[in-house]
Amino acid sequence: MRHLALLAAILVATVTAGYAQEADDPELIFKKTTVWRMLSPDAKLATYALDDPLVEGVACHFTVPEIGGWKGWAGFAEERSEISLACRQVGPISFSGTFEQGEDMYRQRRSMFFKKMQIVRGCDATRNVLVYLVYSDRIIEGSPQNSTSTVPIMPWGDEPAPKCAEFLED
């Protein structure tokens, strides 16, 4: 009976965690086939859009390779580490809280157990520029593959531009 209750609790936690994560999921813009396969799913490049949850007025777009074939379809193939990133100011910038240099903005699993992709955020206080870095890592070793994008914080309309340094945690 104990095992059944524990299994039910794990199932509920897993299901509710999945629903909570959906709010942060990026929006798929499009996919482009890179390797055509007749009898299994194609390999593709997928481009996504993601709004920074802490910094209103900033949107990032990233492109990731998606492995084709049956292993890729089932989630057993290890995804490649090449990820491109572009972030832009798309409206007036406002901060909903403070953040640390290198704080996670978004995280996604790229293989069943070992690899994850991360987009982290920082602030170049001297130039009043938000800096975004995307990279993938493994439990044992990281990957040198990365991409950086910067967003100079500019005034929007009549509002003065906020200073990102004012929202950095010490």
Show where each model-derived region lies.
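Bacterial N-terminal signal peptides that target proteins for export
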Residues: M1-L6
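Bacterial N-terminal signal peptides
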Residues: L7-T14
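Mature extracytoplasmic domains of secretory-pathway proteins
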Residues: G57-A125
